[in-house]
Amino acid sequence: MKFIIVQNICLQDILKKHFPKSSKTTLRSWIHSGRILIDGRYAADLGVELQQGQCVTIRDKFVILAEGIKVLYEDDAVIVVEKPEEMLSVATDFETQNTLQNILKVRLRRKNVFAVHRLDRETSGIMMFACNESAKQSLKTQFEERQIQKTYYALVEGKLVTQQGCWQSYLKEDEKYFVRSTSVENGKLAITEFNQVWSNKQFALLRLKLLTGKKNQLRVHCSEAGHPIVGDKKYRANSNPLRRMALHAYSLTFLHPVKQKKMTFVAPLPTSFDKIAPIKTL
């Protein structure tokens, strides 16, 4: 939705005129989520004074790009998206164009889109990018200091004996790109909290929290616990009823590098998971 300002007016007043049933709290949330733009730039406050001729844009709650990427949030510092499965997060030696990072750069017409973390090609869900060097450094520091909270859901083979707990090991990748636990001297510390939220005789649905962010960490920890993620052939899964790896990045919480406000984004579980587990009850 777009409209042109015909006379000088406060942003809050013009929004109340167009959305009389929306509270001030709701309108403020639109500001914080990057839904309101003034002449193509993100509005910073409800109290800003608008001048005649300026253009105000109210964006939808999210934008779905042609490739199936759902843009949940976008401003001058960060982009938060929901990545579909079977899409590379960033460029590799074998693929540079058909990646989430490059598609965002092209589709959103961004000069810079910096990766601050990754999801495996087979994993769907929440992912975040930085739009400038300052934001990139801030977010990378938050990751390094374990200030960012990431929650995943995974369907795994078998039922866990222990309902909840913590997996901890040192991981190392070999020359064939296979990651496994190793000795303290040779590996990097990886810590995963797990909670079994549903199970039957064949499968279990786990809520997983990354306390560290090592390559293939969740896949390795589940597999080495005797419960490989459904569809994860690389780490010894025997079944693939969903025809995809059943790992989903569900939520992400971080401190906005400019606004200095804690933000949380959620990507609901894929409906395909419901073929095995009753995800609607979560």
Predicted segments with their positions:
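RNA pseudouridine synthases
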Residues: 1-282
